[in-house]
């Protein structure tokens, strides 16, 4: 695991960045080329890496050491466990389910899994979020590849986690000034865009914060 602090509760941050594995790989190469990655990330009050993505980062000792070195240099980089998203959503697990469903709304296998294994006719009968999320990750409906170090790499898990986290911040904290997603993956943009369109109908009485993107383009 990454040897960096864990983020558990929102503390009023107004400039938030979310980062995926592809961006970490790119920035590590930038650093090797003599360009300060730290300078590119200054200005955010918190930079978050979901735990599913931290597992991907740790597939490479170079990426792992790079992130830990940025933390040692003072950048506010934290990992966040997906099970703790419920705390960010004020414990409103029904709404959190809607956000998860929205994040996977373009993936038929994921939708089918949620309909069959998570949804109940009465939402009060659903298992706790942390329980059904853990089961979903253990029984991942999309393809799984075993990496050289023996880890099971679950297709699109990181992108889905980023989308869920972005939407939780967006819909629950209207005073946030900016949410920036660092990714080189087009899927992340598509998932988040579709999730936003879905949630506009689900959360008609809420105001959302826009999510912006940065890549190496």
What is each residue range found by the language model?
Residues 182-185:
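Short beta-strand/turn micro-motifs composed of small residues
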């Amino acid at each position: 695991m990454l040897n960096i602090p864990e983020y558990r509760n929102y503390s009023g941050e107004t400039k938030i960045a979310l980062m995926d594995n592809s961006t970490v790989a790119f920035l590590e190469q930038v650093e090797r080329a003599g360009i300060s990655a730290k300078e590119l990330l200054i200005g955010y009050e918190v930079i978050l890496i979901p735990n599913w993505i931290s597992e991907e980062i740790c597939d490479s000792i170079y990426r792992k050491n790079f992130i830990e070195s940025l933390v040692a240099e003072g950048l506010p980089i934290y990992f966040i466990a997906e099970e703790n998203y419920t705390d960010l959503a004020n414990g409103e697990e029904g709404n959190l389910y809607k956000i998860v469903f929205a994040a996977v709304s373009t993936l038929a296998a994921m939708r089918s899994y949620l309909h069959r294994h998570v949804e109940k006719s009465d939402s009060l009968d659903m298992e706790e979020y942390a329980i059904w999320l853990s089961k979903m990750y253990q029984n991942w409906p999309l393809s799984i590849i075993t990496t050289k170090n023996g880890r099971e790499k679950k297709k699109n898990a990181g992108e889905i986690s980023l989308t869920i986290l972005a939407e939780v911040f967006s819909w629950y904290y209207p005073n946030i000034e900016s949410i920036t997603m660092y990714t080189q993956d087009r899927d992340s943009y598509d998932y988040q865009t579709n999730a936003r369109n879905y949630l506009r109908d689900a959360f008609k009485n809420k105001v959302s914060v826009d999510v912006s993107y940065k890549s190496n383009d």
